[in-house]
């Protein structure tokens, strides 16, 4: 009895004094990490970027398979060249990317966001940038909340085909169709690529939602600067891959015709990075299909481009 009694307080004290203990035991060891980089560059202590995988797919209402998205993107990332042809640098090696083991997603939407929040909170507290990979769009709220708590002026740049502004869907507050509504409870949002929404989606009166529909900017080259101007200094970037044209990301649960081209989407993201501080981002709704690697590879490539933009523009400002 004495031995058991003496051990319990020690465990409790250790957990309280080391809040990053939960992240430490999740770190992937060895070379099977995101981008297959040198393990020395993939430790939690060394890396500036931290990958959180959440293959949650409990509220899917059309095409399935998003639960397999994180693993497919992870595998595809190991085929991505690390040299950035635009900047002539290897930002991924310069700053390091830590990969965490996939989260247990056998739960409901509220619980998975609680789990993501607990991990992302420790990542953000350590001065690192969380990269959340879904899974369906339901998962974004937990990471946004973690960033919002550290950066109270946070706003969200939301690339998507769908506005996701329903207050609830199929009786659920946490659903892939309510992702932006939950985020809007915390901060204002700028949406781009939208081409599917409800007639009435009010949003929060004190936290506006600025919508850039796909049809409005198809012939315009100036909308990106206007969109970025509506963002606050600190920004969370959430990307549903169906915000891009299906020719770029064909394997997704609810594809819509039209959308951002590859370079139009990258241009918007780069402009945001140039004048704002990206403190976290996610890529969601990849639903791999057998016989094609196009979508998951494009998603891995997109993540590498965002890392390059954040490294080149945001980290150079020493703003995190």
Each language-model region and where it sits:
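Polybasic, lysine-enriched low-complexity intrinsically disordered terminal tails
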Residues: 1-14
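Conserved alpha-helical scaffold segments that buttress catalytic/binding sites
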Residues: 3, 16-320
């Amino acid at each position: 009895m004495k031995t058991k009694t003496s051990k319990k307080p020690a465990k409790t004290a250790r957990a309280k004094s080391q809040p990053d203990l939960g992240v430490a035991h999740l770190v992937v060891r060895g070379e099977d990490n995101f981008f297959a980089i040198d393990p020395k560059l993939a430790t939690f202590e060394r890396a500036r970027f931290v990958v959180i995988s959440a293959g949650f797919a409990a509220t899917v209402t059309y095409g399935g398979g998003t639960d397999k998205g994180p693993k497919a993107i992870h595998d595809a990332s190991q085929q991505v060249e690390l040299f950035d042809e635009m900047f002539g640098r290897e930002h991924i090696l310069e700053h390091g990317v830590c990969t965490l083991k996939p989260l247990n997603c056998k739960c409901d939407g509220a619980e998975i966001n609680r789990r993501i929040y607990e991990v992302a909170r420790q990542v953000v507290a350590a001065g690192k940038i969380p990269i959340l990979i879904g899974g369906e769009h339901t998962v974004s709220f937990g990471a946004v909340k973690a960033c919002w708590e550290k950066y109270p002026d946070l706003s969200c740049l939301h690339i998507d085909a769908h506005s996701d502004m329903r207050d609830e869907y199929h009786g659920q507050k946490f659903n892939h169709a309510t992702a932006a509504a939950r985020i809007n409870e915390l901060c204002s949002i700028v949406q781009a690529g939208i081409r599917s929404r409800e007639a009435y989606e009010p949003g929060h009166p004190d936290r506006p939602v600025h919508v850039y529909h796909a049809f409005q900017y198809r012939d315009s080259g100036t909308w990106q600067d206007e969109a970025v101007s509506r963002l606050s200094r600190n920004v969370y970037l959430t990307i549903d891959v169906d915000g891009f044209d299906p020719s770029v990301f064909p394997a997704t649960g609810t594809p819509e015709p039209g959308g951002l081209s590859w370079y139009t989407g990258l241009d918007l993201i780069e402009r945001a990075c140039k004048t704002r501080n990206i403190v976290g981002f996610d890529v969601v709704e990849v639903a791999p299909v057998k016989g094609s690697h196009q979508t998951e590879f494009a998603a891995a490539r997109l993540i590498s481009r965002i890392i390059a933009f954040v490294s080149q523009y945001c980290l150079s400002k020493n703003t995190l």
